[in-house]
Regions:
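Ligand-binding grooves and catalytic loops that recognize ribose/phosphate and carbohydrate rings
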Residues: 275-293
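A short, mixed-charge helix-start or loop-turn motif at secondary-structure junctions
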Residues: 210-214, 269-273, 305-308
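Secreted/periplasmic carbohydrate-active enzymes, especially glycoside hydrolases
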Residues: 1-254, 258-262, 286, 301-302, ...
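Active-site groove signature of glycoside hydrolases
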Residues: 289-314
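Substrate-binding cleft/loops of secretory-pathway carbohydrate-active enzymes
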Residues: 340-342
Length: 342
């Protein structure tokens, strides 16, 4: 139960960091919706559903493993169920900045590209991008769909594991503003070499599960992330594989601050039902959600689409479609998978 006094002209969203695995949500007896997948965020607008006094929130969660699910019934990690990441109320203006992207252009260390997307009735607005340390200030105007893109010449200090440089980035519309810490780097391959900022890098790393350091349960906080990553740092790592599912946002951001390259993965694990269309749609949705949340995290260099999946033609089609989807959403980062020997 909770009470909330919403300011006139504002909108309110109920955000879940993650719920494992199937979540059905009601507010004040009204069915808000259903979410499948235990490792990505989702939200509902509740602006017009609030009571003046006490509000009642009910979440029904089922973490039962199913053969057609992603992951499937056989996976070698603890299947912690329930609400595993923070639940928050987010108040927004009537027209707000729904999403944005700010990174280096592909293979160009001197060009920052990006876009912003507004949501609401007043979609045509002036947008200001401000990166004070780089003396970058760019104004663009969104179109009738609330979208605007930009391309800016600049020479930022490039993010590396040795110098994980991040810049304060501010985006402001006429009705909303957001701030972020963003790093800039290029990533590509040349034969069998991985090139970070056009220099070959050797990735020294380990796999980490999203489990609390000192007791049983899902890790979810900045402190959890810092402890786990500090142990990786003690081992001499510059790279972590966040296995085998999208980890919480605190983990990804702390890894970025601490100088860890990241392999980020969806739980297409072992014996997925390759022929099942719903299974594919589930996997693709988790991939899209992972990329949408973390597209501005420069330390992520690999979107991983699978782990140790037995060879078959149906698997090849399934994974090829996922790889193509990832490339359609992100033409810069590498696409990978951990494969069984074939």
């Amino acid at each position: 139960h909770f009470e909330y006094s919403l300011q006139p002209g504002k909108r309110l969203f109920l955000n879940f960091g993650a719920v494992n695995y199937e979540a059905i949500v009601w507010l004040n007896g009204k069915h808000l919706g259903r979410h499948i997948g235990g490792f990505t965020p989702f939200n509902f607008e509740i602006t017009n559903l609030l009571n003046e006094g006490t509000n009642s929130l009910v979440v029904k969660v089922d973490n039962k493993r199913l053969p057609e699910a992603v992951p499937t019934v056989n996976a070698d990690w603890w299947n912690f169920g329930g609400i595993t990441r923070p639940v928050t109320l987010i108040e927004m203006p009537a027209t707000y900045i729904r999403d944005y992207y700010v990174q280096l252009a592909k293979d160009d260390k001197n060009m920052i590209e990006g876009w912003v997307q507004l949501e609401g009735s007043d979609k045509e607005q002036k947008i200001t991008l401000d990166i004070p340390e780089l003396k970058v200030k760019k104004e663009v105007t969104t179109d009738a769909n609330g979208y605007a893109s930009f391309l800016i010449k600049s020479k930022p200090i490039l993010w590396t594991p040795e110098n994980p440089k991040l810049y304060a980035v501010n985006l402001a519309s006429e009705t909303d503003k957001v701030s972020d810490e963003i790093g800039f780097r290029t990533i590509r391959t040349e034969g069998t070499k991985i090139l970070l900022n056009d220099k070959e890098i050797f990735c020294r790393g380990i796999s980490i599960h999203e489990e609390t350091p000192y007791y049983s349960g899902r890790a979810y906080s900045k402190d959890h992330a810092h402890t786990l990553l500090s142990w990786a740092k003690e081992l001499g790592c510059n790279f972590v594989r966040l296995a085998h599912y999208p980890h919480n946002e605190e983990m990804v951001r702390e890894a970025e601050r601490m100088g860890f390259l990241v392999w980020s993965e969806i739980p297409v694990y072992w014996t997925i039902h390759w022929e099942n269309k719903d299974t594919y749609q589930n996997a693709e949705q988790q991939l899209c959600d992972m990329i949408a949340r973390d597209k501005n995290r420069c330390n992520i260099i690999i979107w991983s689409i699978a782990n140790e999946t037995p060879h078959s033609e149906t698997r090849l089609t399934f994974l090829s479609n996922l790889a193509n989807k990832a490339r359609s959403l992100d033409s810069v980062r590498l696409i990978g998978a951990a494969m069984e020997k074939e």
